[in-house]
Amino acid sequence: MDLSEEALAAAAADAEKAFAAAADLDALAVAKTEHLGGKAPLALAQRALGALPKEEKKDAGKRVNVARGRVAEAFEARRAVLLAERDAAVLVAEAIDVTLPARRQQVGARHPITVISERIADVFVAMGWEVAEGPEVETEHFNFDALNFLPDHPARTMQDTFHIAPEGSRQVLRTHTSPVQVRSMLERDLPIYVVCPGRTFRTDELDATHTPVFSQVEGLAVDKGLTMAHLRGTLDAFARALFGPETRTRMRPNYFPFTEPSAEVDVWFPDKKGGAGWVEWGGCGMVNPKVLIASGIDPEVYSGFAFGMGLERTLQFRNGIPDMRDIVEGDVRFTLPFGIQS
């Protein structure tokens, strides 16, 4: 192996030419193997040093190291250039044209049931009432017994109520938010003024006017000397706050096991065609003395009134929604306008 300065310089020059000719990093890697790898001329020269006489080895070693350093420096310089070219090409390929119009961000909206539920809560909180909540999985005691439903009442059957397994657990998915009223009477100090919004469940098929999961809001007032006049005044104020100052209400006799006397409440409401008419809204009445007793309240001292209505039903005639399925199917094209208007 020729270890002369001329031979080593020639090997280094060949390596520099090969590196300079490399058009990309892959080609540079091939050139590196040829000129800096284990079988490269300078690598062979390094191994040949061992065969030299001692007096020649020192000078030859210096020449080899100088040549190898020259080659390594040329490699790193070319590699830096190719890396910069690659990064520049990536920047060009992935460049963002900041002059293009930005994509409009989609704005979300709260669900209309949430909007109207909060609106109703605000109405009653402004009147000094409190918001009460309760569990959606209820016992039959709170859902039926304490509300004066007889043991053979049809509402208790599998055809109307979702019963929780195992059979005989006496647990159900609540069919109304009335259990929250009973819990409020047991847990709160008198007098009581609470509004109870929440989800309820019944074995209805989903169609234009029914859904198996729906929302209700109920109100309960228990105090000394309350009468139907107080109930009527409360419903009038509620209706005007929710539907507008021209809204009127009326009551029609009805029957509910948990109120006595009981009534249906209708509202006189303008329709989308410019007319107006009576629309059934919900149920109401004076709290049945049996319900007060079941809740630990003396009906000789206290009286109470209660009312309840479905939120989906309220939305339907308040906003002119013909099909209840639109409310529950979660289409953002339907819900967005309600969130904006809230």
UniProtKB/Swiss-Prot annotation:
Question: Subcellular location, in the record's words?
Answer: Cytoplasm
* A GO term, aspect molecular function: ATP binding
Q: Which UniProt keywords apply?
A: Aminoacyl-tRNA synthetase, ATP-binding, Cytoplasm, Ligase, Magnesium, Metal-binding, Nucleotide-binding, Protein biosynthesis
Which coenzymes or cofactors are required?
Answer: Mg(2+)
User: What are the annotated GO cellular component locations?
Assistant: cytoplasm
Q: Which residues bind Mg(2+)?
A: 260
Q: What is its EC number?
A: 6.1.1.20
The principal localisation class reads cytoplasm
Q: Which Pfam families match?
A: Phe_tRNA-synt_N (PF02912), tRNA-synt_2d (PF01409)
What GO biological process terms does the UniProt entry carry, in alphabetical order?
A: phenylalanyl-tRNA aminoacylation
Cofactor: binding details? Binds 2 magnesium ions per tetramer.
| Catalytic activity annotation | tRNA(Phe) + L-phenylalanine + ATP = L-phenylalanyl-tRNA(Phe) + AMP + diphosphate + H(+)
Gene3D superfamilies of this UniProt entry? Bira Bifunctional Protein, Domain 2
> Which InterPro entries does this chain map to?
aa-tRNA-synth_II (IPR006195), aa-tRNA-synth_II/BPL/LPL (IPR045864), Phe-tRNA-synth_IIc_asu (IPR004529), Phe-tRNA_ligase_II_N (IPR004188), Phe_tRNA_ligase_alpha1_bac (IPR022911), Phenylalanyl-tRNA_Synthase (IPR002319), tRNA-bd_arm (IPR010978)
- Quote the CDD domains the UniProt record gives: PheRS_alpha_core
Q: Which family does it belong to?
A: Belongs to the class-II aminoacyl-tRNA synthetase family. Phe-tRNA synthetase alpha subunit type 1 subfamily.
NCBIfam families (UniProt xref): pheS (TIGR00468)
Give the quaternary structure. Answer: Tetramer of two alpha and two beta subunits.
Q: What is this protein called?
A: Phenylalanine--tRNA ligase alpha subunit
Provenance organism = Nocardia farcinica (strain IFM 10152)
Q: Which gene encodes it?
A: pheS
